């Protein structure tokens, strides 16, 4: 029986990593063999852990390229968890497909869109393979409603790959995004 891919997506501050780590906990409580990966590019909370904004953390292996992950995966493994998938190269998709065929469950979390509302390629490719897609939302930083599906970058830097947190980004609903974006055009 093939493994299954669960993909958790949404804007910043929507609880993607929190949900990912809850699945890690479930598998570990069930005495399943797990491994957690993150991109080495994301060192906001350290290099050897995945950490939520609330401070919950799990040990993780930071890899520069998707292919590097395979040398850490020793069979048998029951589940592989990947945070911040938007920062991985698209080779991750081949690796996920290979692991699914080996009956490994995969859980991935990440942004689905850039702050310019462009899709992240690796995330979109994983969506095409996913058995389940969980689309998260956040509280809009501007109007306070629980309807934010977009990330807005408020610093003057046009780079779409730019690691950061509250010093650069906020979660916003579409109405507030359009209002703020039109003021800054």
Swiss-Prot record:
Matching InterPro entries, A to Z? P-loop_NTPase, Thymidine_kinase, Thymidine_kinase_CS
Query: Which GO MF terms does the UniProt record name?
Result: ATP binding; thymidine kinase activity; zinc ion binding
Which positions in this protein are listed as binding Zn(2+)?
140, 143, 173, 176
Kindly list the places in or outside the cell where this protein is found, as annotated in its UniProt entry: Cytoplasm
EC category: transferase
Q: Look up the coiled coil feature and give its residue ranges.
A: none
Active site location: 84 (proton acceptor)
- SUPFAM superfamilies, sorted: Glucocorticoid receptor-like (DNA-binding domain), P-loop containing nucleoside triphosphate hydrolases
Residues holding ATP: 10-17, 83-86
Q: Which UniProt keywords apply?
A: ATP-binding, Cytoplasm, DNA synthesis, Kinase, Metal-binding, Nucleotide-binding, Transferase, Zinc
**Record-level GO BP terms:** DNA biosynthetic process; thymidine metabolic process
Q: Which Pfam families match?
A: TK (PF00265)
Q: Its catalytic activity?
A: thymidine + ATP = dTMP + ADP + H(+)
| Any one GO CC term of the record | cytosol
This protein's superkingdom? Bacteria
EC number(s) from the headed UniProt entry: 2.7.1.21
Q: Which family does it belong to?
A: Belongs to the thymidine kinase family.
According to the record's subunit comment, the protein's assembly and interactions are:
Homotetramer.
Name recorded for this polypeptide: Thymidine kinase
- According to its UniProt entry, this protein's organism is Pseudothermotoga lettingae (strain ATCC BAA-301 / DSM 14385 / NBRC 107922 / TMO) (Thermotoga lettingae)
């Amino acid at each position: 029986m093939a493994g299954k891919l669960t993909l958790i997506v949404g804007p910043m501050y929507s609880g993607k990593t929190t949900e990912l780590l809850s699945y890690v906990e479930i598998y570990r409580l069930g005495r399943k063999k797990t491994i957690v990966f993150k991109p080495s590019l994301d060192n906001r909370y350290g290099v050897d852990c995945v950490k939520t904004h609330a401070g919950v953390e799990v040990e993780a292996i930071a890899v520069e390229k998707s292919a590097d992950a395979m040398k850490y995966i020793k069979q048998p493994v029951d589940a592989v968890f990947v945070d911040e998938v938007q920062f991985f190269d698209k080779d991750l998709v081949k690796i996920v497909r290979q692991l699914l065929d080996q009956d490994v469950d995969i859980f991935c979390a990440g942004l689905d869109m850039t702050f310019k509302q462009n899709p992240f390629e690796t995330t979109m490719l994983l969506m095409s393979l996913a058995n389940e897609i969980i689309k998260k939302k956040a509280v809009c930083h501007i109007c306070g409603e629980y309807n934010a599906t977009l990330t807005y970058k408020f610093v003057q830097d046009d780079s779409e790959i730019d690691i950061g947190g509250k010093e650069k980004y906020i979660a916003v609903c579409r109405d507030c995004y359009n209002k703020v974006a039109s003021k800054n055009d």
